[in-house]
């Protein structure tokens, strides 16, 4: 089993707005299979953490309240399939304005710092861009790429099947501290 599951948002769970940002809940459209994939990941017992760059905040296109509403809508869309997001780590900064914006690893280090029981080698990051995966790889996490030819539901099914085959019976850690 995994200690942590990290997910990118735009292009991984929801349709990416080309040249723009998801700034309102009604603009959030899940990709096919995303709700089922998150439900399957939620079922392994590891916290599921959204790790997302949201430069639209720095650009004044939205504020943190808008982002909270978008993420509340995401939770509503995932819930019927049994999926959940346990925590959200956001970089609201513009490029070159911080150390947390992917492909830097500040957000990943923050998540790991709040989950001291989690071993990066037993954690996975799923994203659609190389910039999503680079920090995970640097920190020793497994990195899985999704996209039109590798939709998230297929990637997750393969990932979980491989994990079950390697580990045998699971010893899922429940309640040993979730990322706040």
What kind of feature is each model-predicted range?
Residues 1-3, 64-87, 95-125, 129-180:
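Asp-based, Mg2+/Mn2+-dependent phosphohydrolase catalytic module
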Residues 1-49:
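Active-site neighborhood of HAD-like aspartate-dependent phosphohydrolases
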Residues 10, 53-54, 128:
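Short, well-ordered beta-to-alpha junction loops that form the rim of enzyme active sites
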Residues 14-16, 59, 134:
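Conserved protein kinase catalytic core
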Residues 18, 53-54, 148:
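Active-site loop/turn elements of alpha/beta-hydrolase fold enzymes
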Residues 34, 38-71, 86-96, 136:
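Substrate-recognition element of Asp-dependent hydrolases with the DxDx(T/V) motif
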């Amino acid at each position: 089993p995994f200690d942590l599951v990290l997910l990118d948002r735009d292009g991984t769970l929801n349709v990416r707005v080309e040249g723009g940002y998801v700034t309102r809940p009604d603009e959030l459209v899940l990709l096919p299979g995303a709700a089922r994939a998150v439900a399957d990941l939620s079922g392994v017992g590891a916290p599921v953490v959204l790790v997302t760059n949201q430069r639209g905040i720095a650009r004044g296109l939205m504020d943190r309240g808008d982002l909270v509403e978008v993420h509340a809508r995401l939770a509503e869309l995932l819930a019927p399939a049994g999926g959940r997001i346990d925590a959200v780590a956001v970089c609201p900064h513009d490029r070159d304005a911080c150390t947390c914006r992917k492909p830097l690893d500040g957000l990943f280090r923050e998540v790991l710092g709040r989950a001291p029981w989690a071993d990066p080698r037993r954690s996975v990051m799923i994203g659609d861009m190389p910039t999503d995966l680079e920090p995970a790889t640097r920190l020793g996490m497994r990195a899985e790429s999704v996209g039109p030819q590798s939709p998230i539901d297929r990637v997750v099914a393969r990932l979980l099947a491989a994990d079950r085959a390697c580990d045998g019976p699971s010893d899922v850690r429940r309640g040993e501290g979730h990322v706040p």
